[in-house]
Design a protein with these regions (language model features):
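Contiguous hydrophobic segments
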Residues: 146, 272-277, 288, 444-478, ...
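Membrane-embedded transmembrane-helix bundle of lipid-linked glycan/lipid transferases
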Residues: 1-223, 227-322, 333-428, 541-546, ...
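Active-site-proximal, structured, solvent-exposed surfaces of multi-pass membrane proteins
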Residues: 466-577
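Positively charged N-terminal leader segments that act as targeting/secretion signals
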Residues: 325-327
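Cytoplasmic C-terminal tails of single-pass
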Residues: 580-589
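A generic short-segment signal for beta-strand/edge and adjacent turn/coil regions
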Residues: 9, 48-49, 128-130, 353-357, ...
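Extracytoplasmic
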Residues: 107, 399-400, 408-499, 503-509, ...
Length: 589
């Protein structure tokens, strides 16, 4: 039973399908970020139909005034959502997205767990991780779809790091390349999760290096120290390779990352840390002067407390278990030349889980305020993503009896359901609600945008929804003819009886270039709202506005291309070296 990979994949996919069955009866859960993602997916699909493969400007945000949403928000989630919208009715896209992403998360956990656990235990870990309470909370209360997708990368992160630690699992430089690819995927999926993943990678690498140093000291004491391609890697080498993977990963993601970093000065990025979404406002059981915030915080805090309790149980009862002996022939079992090495996986999982739990508590506030960029994770309970990797792996090690495992799962699920009913029931959008959203995109009405993507010093709350696309100045009204009004290009003609300024229904973002009668023209902007103001002369004026390719985007594309070529070259070289006879005198790169 369940002895072949296909049957296990069917079980995992089926379990994830069961988890979203409420979608079939009640519609789509309309969590905190539901409209943000749905409108993004719909607009991306619309821009694809205009021939824009990689959108940068969300033209329909702020009711048609636009924002640079797709320049700053990582592309993987909105690409997947738009692709699903291209082949499925919009009313079923959220459910399909959640099912695919939960299944991917479970598959990545199975890939990790199978290295140390028998197939039945690995399948349990995969299903538990895919459907852990925090993932379900994201699906039904938060609709943080990009964050949910990032959860699929966390087991792969640990797997890549352990491959650096266990040279026989995959020789050569390929583990470093796999790690760089995972880190690049993190940047392209969700920025707060990418910060969390990089901090996790750094911390886990330091622990691995310490374990390697302890193994080396133990080998010295026993007279067994022998550094070779088949021995434990030197701690410094592990640190260097992780650093190289981080650099290469950032290089691969530079086509998104460099413009997002460089053009932050053109928006008010401080809005992402406004009151209510700051770390200090979102520690477990924290209350502020916002009843809605407090109810949701109580819900997520209750779920987190239950999961922390389960983690402590799993850590305590798995402390004497040898990970490698659970699955004969796995890398740990083959390479466990010392007790420290045999328990490396357990130590990493324990440290990762405990540190994740601590970072959700207010006692860690000084870390959030002083560690570079950590505060841009916004909400500390995002560390539940990492904590659940540890819990999913440690629980089958601690509880060998299926009754204990199922009881633990039942208690956690009951906690989520009861806390949800008591503190904050989920909201639901029916097919008619999603149809209204789709109509707002189709007819050009647009939607409410996000404050953090509005050009700096501009006030989106003062916008006039009834403003025409182009408005003339004082005096005689000019004759205006719209020729093109697309997401990345606007073109119109104006016949004016006197020189005047035109106001365009468009934020004056620096990437917009304006050409009047074939000549580049410097623009101004309106007070308060910051709309584009174009000076024109009397007579006929042909005006062309286009979203230009800035130098930072060009450099980002070049860096990504160079990084990709480097990755392919090094991968091919490592692949050739893997088939060469080992040199007993060498030490590997």
């Amino acid at each position: 039973m369940l002895r072949n990979p296909i049957s296990r994949a069917v079980v995992l996919a089926g379990a994830c399908l069961v988890a979203i069955t409420p979608f079939f009866w009640w519609g789509s859960p309309s969590g905190h970020d539901f409209e943000f993602h749905m409108f993004s997916w719909m607009e991306v699909l619309g821009q694809w139909k205009h021939g824009i493969a990689y959108p940068r400007w969300a033209a329909l945000a702020h009711w048609g005034y636009g924002e640079a949403r797709f320049l700053f928000y990582p592309p993987v989630s909105w690409t997947l959502g738009a692709a699903l919208g291209a082949v499925l009715p919009w009313k079923v896209v959220p459910g399909a997205y959640c099912w695919i992403v939960l299944t991917l998360a479970g598959a990545s956990m199975y890939r990790l767990a199978r290295q140390w656990l028998p197939a039945p235990d690995a399948l349990f870990a995969a299903v538990f991780y895919a459907l852990n309470p925090y993932h379900l909370l994201i699906v039904y209360w938060r609709s943080a779809y990009a964050e949910l997708l990032a959860a699929a990368l966390l087991p792969l992160l640990l797997l890549c790091l352990l491959r650096l630690f266990l040279p026989e699992s995959e020789p050569g430089f390929r583990p470093t390349l796999w790690l760089s690819f995972t880190l690049a995927a993190a940047w392209l999926t969700n920025a707060p999760a990418a910060v969390m993943i990089h901090y996790s990678a750094a911390g886990l690498t330091l622990i691995l290096a310490a374990i390697q140093a302890a193994i080396g000291a133990e080998q010295d004491a026993a007279g067994l120290r022998s550094w070779s391609p088949q021995s434990w890697r030197h701690p410094v080498r592990t640190l260097v390779r992780t650093a190289l993977a981080m650099l290469l990963g950032a290089g691969l993601a530079s086509f998104y990352l460099l413009p997002a970093i460089y053009e932050q000065k053109w928006i008010d990025v401080s809005q992402v840390l406004s009151p209510g979404v700051r770390p200090q406002d979102n520690f477990l059981f924290r209350t502020i002067a916002d009843p809605d915030h407090n109810r949701f915080n109580l819900l997520v805090s209750t779920v987190a407390l239950a999961e922390i309790g389960a983690l402590m149980f799993a850590i305590w009862f798995s402390r004497k278990k040898h990970v490698g002996t659970a699955a004969p022939g796995c890398p740990v079992a083959r390479n466990a030349t010392a007790v420290s090495a045999d328990r490396a996986c357990w130590m990493l999982l324990t440290a990762w889980g405990v540190s994740s739990a601590v970072l959700m508590l207010s006692v860690s506030n000084s870390l959030w305020q002083h560690l570079p960029k950590l505060r841009f994770m916004q909400i500390p309970f995002r560390w539940l993503l990492c904590m659940n990797v540890a819990l999913a792996m440690l629980l089958p090690m601690a509880a060998k009896r299926w009754t204990t495992r199922l009881l633990t799962c039942a208690l956690l699920l009951a906690t989520l359901i009861l806390a949800g009913r008591r503190f904050q029931p989920p909201w639901w959008d029916m097919a008619s609600d999603i149809r209204q959203m789709s109509n707002a995109i189709a007819d050009g009405t647009g939607y409410e945008g996000s404050d953090e993507y509005v050009p700096a010093a501009d006030d989106a709350y003062e916008l006039d929804k009834s403003l025409p696309l182009v408005v003339g100045g004082t005096g005689a009204l000019p004759r205006i003819q719209i020729l093109v009004w697309g997401p990345a290009e606007k073109r119109f003609t104006v016949r004016a009886t006197a020189p005047q300024n035109l106001t365009v229904r468009l934020f004056n973002y620096p990437a917009w270039a304006v050409v009047v009668n074939g000549k580049p023209t410097a623009t101004q902007k309106t007070d308060v709202t910051g709309l584009i103001v174009i000076p024109i002369g009397a007579g006929d004026n042909d005006i062309h506005i286009h979203f230009r390719r800035t130098i930072d985007r060009l450099i980002g594309n070049v860096v990504s291309l160079i990084s990709l070529v480097l990755l392919v070259v090094v991968w091919m070289r490592a692949r050739r070296e893997a088939f060469r006879p080992a040199n007993p005198e060498g030490s590997g790169v």
